């Protein structure tokens, strides 16, 4: 299949730049698989399409503040996007790096508590970077890292490239209400519309809920650079399925639910 077969027009004014005031009041499109009929509802009405005995599987990954902006020794700006922790070292991450003349041996200063050392180039703009800090890296990221919003969500930036007055709404709303295990660099967006009251109503209707963890990776937003879709290389993502959840899912499938 050719990538051009998937092209369509999406007017910019139809791309919401702020979340709906109430999570579960986002729009919901329902397609009837038998007749193809389309209904336009609100998300909290999803409960009308679930019945007692159904199993709802949720992704409890938590988005990390993976965007860092710093300066090289020359004074040039460098933007870092953390992708995945290296298996061999706690302080080494594979990162997407934006900026000129990034090469092994370059140091990037983010603030007084954090600097990065470029170790090696992996390819496609990705580098392995060792982070130097006298504190816990996750704590520092929570303080100075920024939410990795999708590129179609625009926020004003200062001269250094950081988002101005990062919204607490962005910090909170770009997580699901059941976000728990840190590791995603993008939100599992289908889950963003659930609320605690809606989940309680779902449980009260006799619907079971099972949690799995899929750390959403950069492949969810990186561009497809090939003409033939079959030539596109999907990036791997880490996941974990607890034994209790696996049992619930297998039982539901066996029973045809």
Which role fits each region the language model picked out?
Residues 1-257:
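Surface-exposed, charge/polar-rich loops and edge strands
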